[in-house]
Amino acid sequence: EDGVSYETYHFPYEQLDRAISAGAPTGQIKVHAKSLTGKILGASVLGERAGELITAFTIAMRNGVTLRNIGDTIHPYPAYGEGVRRVADQWYVQKQSPTFTKVLQTVFGYRGPVLKYGPDEIV
């Protein structure tokens, strides 16, 4: 879509426990989504079980499922499909407001460090 603000999120197979245990940690999942809403605009998967994983994104795009919806869904572990949720988590975590984080710190009395998430960070 022309003029649409979007971000790209990725999750490497080398951090996907199922891929590691199968001896196939080479590959990645990449998703392009609207910055504000998490609406999926496109996705690509390179690696083991790519054909199975891309289906999740195809269904999501066709039915208006957002990265937030995927991130809120429990996925089996260890499974390649967990990579779908982990890439969705990239969007979810980056949308947490610093103000909300500070409120939580105050309410729960947390004084330790708070991780800073950016487009190149993997959660």
PLM feature spans:
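Flexible, glycine-rich terminal cap/loop adjacent to redox cofactors
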Residues: 1-123
